[in-house]
């Protein structure tokens, strides 16, 4: 009986091989994987276009809050980037909305950088805030214990009661560290100072390629919008990041890709 089964198995294997069945099965498996990649790619594109890049409510809140603080004499657009102290009132007034945006859109980071100068005229350190949530899929902590502060003024850190990352700095250090401006900051800002009268902030949204925040191990790609006041003056950028580690969690292991080839909308 065993000999008969062995013979039948040998014949079956031979027929599959000579009939091209193995090749067909392999192709079918490849087609299934390819379709899963296409489906997941469509999912990611939908997230990028309709969720992660939906920052209009956040930018409106920042602009409205900034305008109110200016009218109260607590903030001056022309001096927002002078120091951490000049930017702190606005940061504290909008940080809850920044965190809310991170939560609702399930992103791994959110940031604001203030600036009032042409970035082509030299490197300067800039005030702002950068928050991280390395696991947006987990249940959010009511006290924000799952968040980390990457950049924020000391007074903001004290007020938020959120832990700082080991790479925390009170400012975005460009001149001090002698590093060029991050692309997610430089490109949308410079584009906006030349076009703020012709295009809205949303029109100038910018998907940036992968980068690492100085002294951070987390590689991420970004989406940024310029901050533009009622007079058309550009006073900073706001945006989100998606770490590549998190993106890999959204993809089954067979679909992990090289993000240097990721096509951004």
Give, region by region, the residue ranges found by the protein language model.
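Well-ordered, non-membrane alpha-helical segments in soluble/globular domains
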Residues: 84-96, 181-189
């Amino acid at each position: 009986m065993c000999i008969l089964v062995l013979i039948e198995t040998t014949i079956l294997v031979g027929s599959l091989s000579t009939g091209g069945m193995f090749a067909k099965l392999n192709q079918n498996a490849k087609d299934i994987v390819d379709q899963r990649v296409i489906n997941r790619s469509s999912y990611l594109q939908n997230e990028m276009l309709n969720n992660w890049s939906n920052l209009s409510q956040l930018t409106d809140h920042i602009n409205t809050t900034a305008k109110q603080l200016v009218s109260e004499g607590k903030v001056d657009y022309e001096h927002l980037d002078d120091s951490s102290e000049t930017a702190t009132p606005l940061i504290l007034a909008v940080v809850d909305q920044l965190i809310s945006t991170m939560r609702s859109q399930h992103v791994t980071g959110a940031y604001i950088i203030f600036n009032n100068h042409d970035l082509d005229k030299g490197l300067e350190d800039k005030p702002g805030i950068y928050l991280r949530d390395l696991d947006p899929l987990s249940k959010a902590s009511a006290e924000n214990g799952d968040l980390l502060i990457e950049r924020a003024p000391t007074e903001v850190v004290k007020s938020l009661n959120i832990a700082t990352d080991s790479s925390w700095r009170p400012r975005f250090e460009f001149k001090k560290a002698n590093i060029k401006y991050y692309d997610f900051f430089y490109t949308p800002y410079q584009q906006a100072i030349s076009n703020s009268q012709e295009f809205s902030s949303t029109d100038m949204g910018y998907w940036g390629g992968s980068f690492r925040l100085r002294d951070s191990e987390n590689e991420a790609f970004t989406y940024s919008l310029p901050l533009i006041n009622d007079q058309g003056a550009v006073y900073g950028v706001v945006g989100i990041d998606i770490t590549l580690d998190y993106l890999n969690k959204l993809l089954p292991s067979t679909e992990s890709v090289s993000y240097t080839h990721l096509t951004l909308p």
